[in-house]
C-alpha cells in the first residue's frame, strides 16, 4: 500500500511539473508543493493528530509562496493533488492550514478557483 501511495505521489509531482511549466513567472512549482506536503498525506486520509512534520511543511509552503503567482500556483497544485490522490478527506484537507496556524483565504477543495486569490487576501 505504501508503494502505491508513493507511486501516485511521484506521478502527481511529474504531472504538476508539466502543468506548471507555462507559469514561468511563478517561482514555486507543483513538484515543490507536493513534495513539501508529503508528510501530511497520512493525516489527510485518516485524520487524528496532525504530525509536527506536516505543520512544518504547511508553514514552509506558506512562507515559500511570497507572490500572487506563487500563491495561485500553490493553490492550483493543492487543487490538483486533492483531485488526483485517492482517499483524501475533504474536512481534513480544508481544515489543515488552520490546525497548523496558517491563515488562508480559502479552503482547499476540488472546486476552488485559484485565479481569484491574490496576495492581498492573505493575512500574515
UniProtKB/Swiss-Prot annotation:
Signal peptide: 1-26
GO annotation, biological process: lipid transport
Disulfide bonds: 30-77, 40-54, 55-100, 75-114
CDD domains, alphabetized: nsLTP1
Classification via SUPFAM superfamilies: Bifunctional inhibitor/lipid-transfer protein/seed storage 2S albumin
Single GO MF descriptor: lipid binding
Matches recorded under SMART domains: AAI
Keywords: Allergen, Disulfide bond, IgE-binding protein, Lipid-binding, Signal, Transport
Family the entry assigns: Belongs to the plant LTP family.
Protein's job: Plant non-specific lipid-transfer proteins transfer phospholipids as well as galactolipids across membranes. May play a role in wax or cutin deposition in the cell walls of expanding epidermal cells and certain secretory tissues.
Record-linked PANTHER family: NON-SPECIFIC LIPID-TRANSFER PROTEIN 2-RELATED (PTHR33076)
Name of this protein: Non-specific lipid-transfer protein
Organism field: Macadamia integrifolia (Macadamia nut)
Organism lineage: Eukaryota, Viridiplantae, Streptophyta, Embryophyta, Tracheophyta
Amino acid at each position: 500500500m505504501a508503494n502505491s501511495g508513493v507511486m501516485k505521489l511521484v506521478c502527481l509531482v511529474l504531472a504538476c511539473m508539466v502543468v506548471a511549466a507555462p507559469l514561468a513567472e511563478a517561482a514555486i512549482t507543483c513538484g515543490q508543493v507536493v513534495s513539501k506536503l508529503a508528510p501530511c498525506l497520512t493525516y489527510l486520509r485518516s485524520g487524528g493528530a496532525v504530525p509536527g512534520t506536516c505543520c512544518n511543511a504547511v508553514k514552509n509552503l506558506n512562507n515559500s509562496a511570497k507572490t500572487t503567482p506563487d500563491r495561485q500556483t500553490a493553490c492550483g497544485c493543492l487543487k490538483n493533488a486533492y483531485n488526483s490522490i485517492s482517499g483524501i478527506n475533504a474536512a481534513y484537507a480544508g481544515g489543515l492550514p488552520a490546525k497548523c496556524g496558517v491563515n488562508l483565504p480559502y479552503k482547499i477543495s476540488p472546486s476552488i478557483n485559484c485565479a481569484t486569490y491574490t496576495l492581498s487576501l492573505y493575512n500574515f
